Amino acid sequence: MKNSADITVLGAGSYGSALAISLASNGHKTLLWGHDPVHMQTLAQDKCNQAFLPGIAFPDCLQIEADLAKALAASNNVLVVVPSHVFGTVLEQAKPLLRSDARIVWATKGLEPETGRLLQDVARDVLGEQYPLAVLSGPTFAKELAMGLPTAISVAGTCPTFTNDLVELLHSPKRLRVYANDDFTGLQLGGAVKNVIAIGAGMSDGIGFGANARTALITRGLVELTRLGEALGANAATFMGMAGLGDLVLTCTDNQSRNRRFGLALGKGCDVMTAQAEIGQVVEGYRNTKEVFTLAKRLGVEMPITEQIYQVLYQGKSPVDAAKELLSREKKSETPAQ
């Protein structure tokens, strides 16, 4: 079946819109679909996403499509950019409408709610084995990507041809550098765990602990991510790249991060509900914390920072008490014997 578009993007929030803008700015005909018809009509009229990316005009190659069937019929390349807690639901909606030659990539960062499963497992459960799968991950703030500021990300998948095609589609010499990676598991995990650690970094700064504490938390957070990744068969080297260290540093240190701002509010004394309301958009790290904690417990992986953040978010522990518990842990070597 011939494509009438180069790629279809499912999810018209800030990140989905930014990726669609970047793709269309490369000269690729891009369809952008969202679940809210009123929102999609507004996007079509304004020719920009005024709600999430105000003032950034859509390129001529970007087309708004409110009909999911039409959006999925237009291209065999489907990029899913929705919150992790609705990822499976969106795939269920898409499944009967997908072309037989469809190829699915997602930029969703997170794990399955309640179970902590990787999104690749969710996708396989819903879609079966017939479609090539891939994931896009790395340090990207939507606004900067949409503005065309230099950005670098990684992509990995189940099919090398699809991965290479995505590199060609997404890469732009002027705005976006894309690295191919063969660690499908590692790229998915990095995008979830960094959200958790960013909440912790925000809490630390909100309390007023300073740059030393923030840096220590980021460094030990990277250790936790690597530990969990290795337990799942990921390559430790992945976590020194874009989807690990890169995304972790970005999300933990810049207030464009909703997860960091959420943590800041908690550190300054807000309760969880008030802090979420203050952000006004989905704070992926709130759910990710429970998901990562669940996964670590199931695998028997020690993740003390994640555990303390979980206790703050879900068990009412104060951020100060969580910090005290981390600092009072038993002394240990930074490089334990293997």
From Swiss-Prot:
- Which cysteine pairs are joined by S-S bonds? none
- rRNA-binding listed as a keyword: no
Pathway annotation from the record: Membrane lipid metabolism; glycerophospholipid metabolism
User: What keywords is this UniProt entry annotated with?
Assistant: Cytoplasm, Lipid biosynthesis, Lipid metabolism, NAD, NADP, Nucleotide-binding, Oxidoreductase, Phospholipid biosynthesis, Phospholipid metabolism
For this UniProt entry, what's an example GO CC term?
cytosol
Q: Which residues does the annotation say bind NADPH?
A: 14-15, 35, 109, 142, 258, 282, 284
* Catalytically driven reaction(s): sn-glycerol 3-phosphate + NAD(+) = dihydroxyacetone phosphate + NADH + H(+); sn-glycerol 3-phosphate + NADP(+) = dihydroxyacetone phosphate + NADPH + H(+)
Q: Where in the cell is it found?
A: Cytoplasm
EC numbers, comma separated: 1.1.1.94
UniProt-annotated catalytic positions: 194
Instruction: Kindly list the positions annotated as binding sn-glycerol 3-phosphate.
Output: 109, 138, 140, 194, 247, 257-259
Q: Name one Pfam family in it.
A: NAD_Gly3P_dh_N
Recorded GO MF terms: glycerol-3-phosphate dehydrogenase [NAD(P)+] activity; NAD binding
Name the predominant localization. Answer: cytoplasm
Which InterPro entries is this protein grouped with? 6-PGluconate_DH-like_C_sf, 6PGD_dom2, G3P_DH_NAD-dep, G3P_DH_NAD-dep_C, G3P_DH_NAD-dep_N, NAD(P)-bd_dom_sf
Task of the protein: Catalyzes the reduction of the glycolytic intermediate dihydroxyacetone phosphate (DHAP) to sn-glycerol 3-phosphate (G3P), the key precursor for phospholipid synthesis.
Among PANTHER family, the record links this protein to: GLYCEROL-3-PHOSPHATE DEHYDROGENASE, GLYCEROL-3-PHOSPHATE DEHYDROGENASE [NAD(+)] 2, CHLOROPLASTIC
NCBIfam families tied to this protein = PRK00094.1-1, PRK00094.1-2, PRK00094.1-4
- Write the protein's name: Glycerol-3-phosphate dehydrogenase [NAD(P)+]
Origin organism of this chain?
A: Shewanella baltica (strain OS195)
Q: What is the lineage of its organism?
A: Bacteria, Pseudomonadati, Pseudomonadota, Gammaproteobacteria, Alteromonadales
